[in-house]
Regions:
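N-terminal small/polar loop signature for handling phosphorylated ligands or for N-terminal nucleophile
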Residues: 53, 65-131, 215-277
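Phosphate-binding and adjacent anionic-ligand microenvironments
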Residues: 301-474, 479-512
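Gly/Ser/Thr-enriched, mixed-charge loops and adjacent short helices
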Residues: 113, 130-256
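Short glycine-rich phosphate-binding loop at a beta-alpha junction
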Residues: 61-71, 95, 199-201, 304-310, ...
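Proline/glycine-rich low-complexity loops and linkers
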Residues: 97-98, 102, 152-183, 193, ...
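An N-terminal, well-structured beta->alpha segment
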Residues: 6-83, 89-90, 165-200
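A short, gly/pro- and small-residue-rich
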Residues: 129-153, 277-293, 366-377
Length: 512
């Protein structure tokens, strides 16, 4: 077994490989009472060497340039320093972009003033403060699962003939200027400040998205007073920076209503996801955000296909089809839906949008990059025209039917091989015989049932979490009073598996 020495002792290949999280790298970056750090300075040095080896395999260039950035996490500065030091030691030229966003790091490979061979972002998205991670981009796009496997399994260090050159640069300003130019070009108003007269509040959740107020919205003329949590703070003291989190969405809702804003914008930590709140306080995330963006792309590209992840509403499918489009449900995971969209385009099926209910959204016109700020830019392009026509954002999805009841339950799997347990449960629920439960054949992830009487009218999906030891149950119903009966039947079924922790379920059905 290959071992390596470092400041913090020996690192085994197996330990490095355990940091792989599909097409990302994630780990514990800070010791806590419950966890011991495994994404350490030593680990990051090994990973940096792996990135260099991966690039050398792909690019076969005498000189490589890599851009490096981080979000607001407490461990970010130290890990960034280690990453940069190892890259320079290997002879790679490095742009240190400091605080940045994940989409901006990819764009550093496209902007001519940088032309990076790769962009490397230190982030763990919305996970707790003690996590961190690494996302890697080449000029072709985000690293795939097999690329990360190669990086983590090829960490042999090579000293460059000469040390690389380090340059500090302001990437976010370049990135923001690019967004501003696109919004101006596409806006209904032929003016430098098409958002004059609009009040737009931003909630950055103390992540990296605060730049959007000053460098994008204010430049376009918007009033951003009332924006909150713009200062980067890796303790995340106000709420989880996650547009898929109810507490976070309540926070931006309150800000919109309190400040009488025309729009509220919320980003996750590294700005690859976003959501909006309308003037009336309505939340546009999950199915509603997919519907808004679907209407936009279908107005620009009639008949296009739209790839989503699996836990989307039946009503969303009907909405997209009513606009002349086609929804393709696929496996959760932003790389999965993006790759499915790329596959469809290669097959000659025009597919303009790949999007998850979590807020990851990637447009064909924007390199199929999941970019939360670009999503907001697409919406901002519409605001002046909607105002001129006396319409609201909500009007874009007035025809989208909303379920009367929804519920999500996450069951912790307390088994060493939790994936095997989850797979077994999903395989065995196929044989369940309950009147009103019918397996939906149009599904690629977990198992999806259509519900009819005596269980109302709706659906539920049972699937494994992509990143955590969780079994996720999502239910929608168009009739009131049927969520609990479904949950009770699910409880009876899961009682056969003692390693499934049902503590999140019990309060939902107690005394009902």
């Amino acid at each position: 077994m290959l071992t390596k020495s470092s400041l913090e002792g020996e690192f085994f290949v197996e330990e490095i490989m355990n940091l792989q999280n599909e097409s990302d790298i994630r780990g514990i970056a800070m010791d806590t009472k419950e966890y011991q750090a495994n994404l350490t300075v030593s680990a990051v040095r090994e990973i940096a060497a792996g990135i260099v080896n991966w690039l050398n395999k792909m690019e076969k260039k005498d000189e490589l340039t890599v851009g490096v950035g981080r979000d607001s996490r407490l461990s970010g500065p130290e890990l960034k320093e280690a990453l940069i030091e190892e890259l320079i030691h290997s002879g790679v030229n490095v742009y240190d972009f400091g605080l940045a966003t994940t989409p901006a790091l990819f764009m550093s490979t496209q902007f001519s003033q940088f032309s990076c061979d790769a962009g490397v972002m230190l982030t763990a998205s919305h996970l707790p403060y003690y996590y961190n991670g690494i996302k890697v981009f080449s000029q072709k796009g985000g690293a795939e699962k097999e690329d990360i496997t190669y990086i983590l399994s090829h960490t042999e260090k090579r000293q460059g003939v000469t040390a690389g050159k380090l340059t500090e640069a302001d990437l976010l300003t370049v990135y923001a200027n690019n967004l501003v130019a696109k919004i101006r070009t596409a806006s209904y108003k032929d003016t430098e400040k098409p958002l004059t007269g609009f009040k737009i509040v931003v909630d950055a959740g103390n992540g990296a998205g605060g730049f959007f107020t000053e460098k994008v919205l204010q430049v376009l003329g918007a009033d951003t007073s009332g924006s909150q949590f713009l200062t980067p703070d890796g303790n995340f003291p106000n709420h989880i920076p996650n547009p898929d989190n109810k507490e976070a969405m309540r926070s931006i809702q309150d800000a919109v209503l309190t400040n009488h804003a025309d729009l509220g914008v919320i980003f996750d930590t590294d700005v690859d996801r976003s959501a909006v709140v309308t003037k009336s306080g309505d939340v546009l995330n999950r199915n509603n955000l997919i519907a808004v963006l679907s209407r936009i792309v279908l107005s620009e590209h009639p008949g296009t296909s739209i790839v989503t992840n699996s836990p989307t509403s039946d009503h969303l499918k009907d909405f997209i089809e009513s606009l002349g489009g086609k929804q393709v449900r696929y496996i959760s995971g932003y790389r999965n839906v993006i790759n499915k969209a790329l596959e469809l385009n290669r097959a000659g099926i025009d597919t303009q949008l790949a999007i998850e209910t979590s807020g990851h959204a990637a447009f064909k016109e924007n390199y199929f990059l999941d970019d939360g700020a670009y999503v907001i830019a697409k919406i901002l392009m519409l605001l002046p025209k909607l105002q001129e026509e006396g319409k609201s954002l909500e009007s874009l999805i007035a025809d989208l039917k909303q379920p009367l009841e929804t519920q999500e339950v996450r069951f912790k799997l307390e088994a060493e091989n939790y994936r095997a347990l989850g797979k077994k449960i999903i395989e065995q629920i196929v044989d369940i015989q309950i009147p009103g439960w019918q397996i939906d054949p149009e599904n690629d992830e977990g198992i999806r049932f259509r519900l009819s009487q005596p269980y109302g009218q709706g659906w539920f999906l049972l699937r494994m979490s992509l990143h955590e030891p969780l079994l996720v149950l999502q239910i929608e119903n168009d009739e009131k009073g049927y969520i609990v009966p479904v949950l009770k039947k699910m409880q009876q079924f899961l009682n056969n598996y003692p390693e499934v922790n049902q503590e999140k379920l019990t309060p939902l059905i107690a005394n009902v």
